[in-house]
């Protein structure tokens, strides 16, 4: 079994760019950014429970990494960068720390490196279980209307929130809930030490209005790019800013 993805081919000899979306996104999420890099072959992945991979269920990050690895092999991708937002960023960091043959580097936008104590994990598990129950049992428009009121999305205006609620409500609530629980921050290990000892290139992107993740970025041994005029979802709020940062990263 492999993950559903859309592949776009560029010039031979360059590494692939493999894009991983955030929670409730899909393979379309990164394409405005990715299509600015037409020289590179691009793979836009649907994570388990999402888009064309909605029917794929996993028990945890190890399963996701295994599926990602098999997907890369199926497309004969031998050299690549992982580019991930939020959940996709956490998947990218986990997979990279577990080891992926052919990995050139990782670019993470607003991805959490992991909680640092049992109390934080227990609180996150309670929260994610409550959200998962809502995703399983309530209309998605109602759930996402509340989801985008969370502090991490404080930079969004009302129109942006409404647009995201409509977009995300096309998902399957049950499969979103399953993925939310399987890849909760409550079950993700703290990756700070692994990332400090990494053997791959590592870059971090965060919006200038995303104070939580700017603080987290400062804890990581990573080259951090602050995206102007953007909050947590920087590639949606300022795609040109993310394109500029990614172009700078790929020039090295």
Swiss-Prot record:
Catalysed conversion reaction: 5-enolpyruvoyl-6-hydroxy-2-succinyl-cyclohex-3-ene-1-carboxylate = (1R,6R)-6-hydroxy-2-succinyl-cyclohexa-2,4-diene-1-carboxylate + pyruvate
Single GO MF descriptor: 2-succinyl-6-hydroxy-2,4-cyclohexadiene-1-carboxylate synthase activity
UniProt keyword annotations, A-Z: Lyase, Menaquinone biosynthesis
Pathway this chain belongs to: Quinol/quinone metabolism; 1,4-dihydroxy-2-naphthoate biosynthesis; 1,4-dihydroxy-2-naphthoate from chorismate: step 3/7; Quinol/quinone metabolism; menaquinone biosynthesis
Disulfide pattern: none
InterPro entries: AB_hydrolase_1 (IPR000073), AB_hydrolase_fold (IPR029058), SHCHC_synthase_MenH (IPR022485)
Membrane-spanning residues: none
Pfam families with a match to the protein in the record: Abhydrolase_6
PANTHER family: 2-SUCCINYL-5-ENOLPYRUVYL-6-HYDROXY-3-CYCLOHEXENE-1-CARBOXYLATE SYNTHASE (PTHR42916), PROTEIN PHYLLO, CHLOROPLASTIC (PTHR42916:SF1)
NCBIfam families linked to this entry: menH_SHCHC, PRK11126.1
Family per similarity comment: Belongs to the AB hydrolase superfamily. MenH family.
Name of protein: 2-succinyl-6-hydroxy-2,4-cyclohexadiene-1-carboxylate synthase
Species of provenance: Escherichia coli O157:H7
Taxon lineage: Bacteria, Pseudomonadati, Pseudomonadota, Gammaproteobacteria, Enterobacterales
The encoding gene: menH
């Amino acid at each position: 079994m492999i993950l559903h993805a859309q592949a776009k081919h560029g010039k031979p000899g360059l590494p692939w760019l493999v894009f991983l979306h955030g929670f409730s996104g899909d393979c379309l999420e990164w394409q405005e950014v990715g299509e600015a890099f037409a020289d590179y072959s691009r793979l836009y992945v649907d994570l388990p429970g999402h888009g064309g991979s909605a029917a794929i269920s996993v028990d945890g990050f190890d399963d996701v990494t295994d599926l990602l690895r098999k997907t890369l092999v199926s497309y004969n991708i031998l050299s690549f960068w992982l580019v991930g937002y939020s959940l996709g960023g956490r998947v990218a960091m986990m997979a990279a720390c577990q080891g992926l043959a052919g990995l050139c580097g990782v670019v993470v936008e607003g991805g959490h490196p992991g909680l640092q104590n049992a109390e934080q994990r227990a609180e996150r598990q309670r929260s994610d279980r409550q959200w998962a129950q809502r995703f399983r049992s309530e209309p998605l428009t109602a759930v996402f209307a509340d989801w985008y009121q969370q502090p991490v999305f404080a930079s969004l205006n009302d129109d942006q929130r409404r647009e995201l609620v409509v977009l995300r409500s096309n998902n399957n609530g049950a499969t979103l809930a399953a993925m939310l629980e399987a890849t909760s921050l409550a079950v993700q290990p703290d990756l700070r030490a692994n990332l400090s000892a990494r053997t791959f290139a590592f870059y971090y992107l965060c919006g200038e209005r995303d104070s939580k993740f700017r603080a987290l970025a400062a804890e990581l041994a990573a080259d951090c790019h602050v995206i102007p005029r953007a909050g947590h979802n920087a590639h949606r709020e300022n795609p040109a800013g993310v394109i500029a940062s990614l172009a700078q990263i790929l020039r090295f």
